[in-house]
Every structure is written in structure tokens, then in C-alpha cells.
Amino acid sequence: CLDTGHIQLVHRQPADYIRKAGSRLKLLHMHENDAYGDLHQMPYTFGSSKECGTDWDSLASALADIGFDGTLSFETFPCMNSFPYGTRDEVLRTIHEVGVYIKGKIDVLSEQFVQNSVKNK
């Protein structure tokens, strides 16, 4: 299990740790922070600069590279408190759609990785 936000707290990017874990990685806790506080915000909240946010494209690429087929767990409950109570269902839908988007990127990159591997044989 790796935690994207906790990796950010030591000013690193999760992609390196994902590749090191390889096939042993079965669960990824996904959330965003500002690299200074463990804020548990939804992915992309702070952009994708290496100084402040998670590089989500590199993360998706690393997951594709290792053939990840585990669980993506979104630890984003604290971000719910940032929105008015009446909008929470929509916020949950947005978090879900972000998850679908990231999973789609992983799937596309995985397919490209397989195709390139076949071509290079």
C-alpha cells in the first residue's frame, strides 16, 4: 500500500515509489495535498507542479508500467468540508469522475505499453 499524499509530504512524487513497489503494489491511497500539510484533497486540487502537487500523469504512467490491477482508494473525505452541505453529492460525483479519468489514463497507457512490448520483440 502506498499513499500519494504522504509521499508528497516528503517532497517526492509517487511514480518513483510505484515503480519500486512493482507487482507488490495492491492498494494505492490517492489524495492530494500541498506538500506541507496532510490535507486529503481530491486529485488535481493543487495542479501537477512538482513543487506543490502530485504529477498525476506520471503516476498513471507508472501504474501502467507495472501492470497495476489493484485498488485505487480515494482518501478525500476532508475535502467534503470545503463545500456547502447541499453540494456534497455533486462533490462525490466529481471525485468519482476524477477516479474514472485516472483509471482511463492507466488503461490507455497499459495498452500502449503492451503494444510497444510486442513491437519490440
Task: Report each predicted region and the residues it spans.
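Histidine-acidic metal/acid-base catalytic patches
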Residues: 1-121
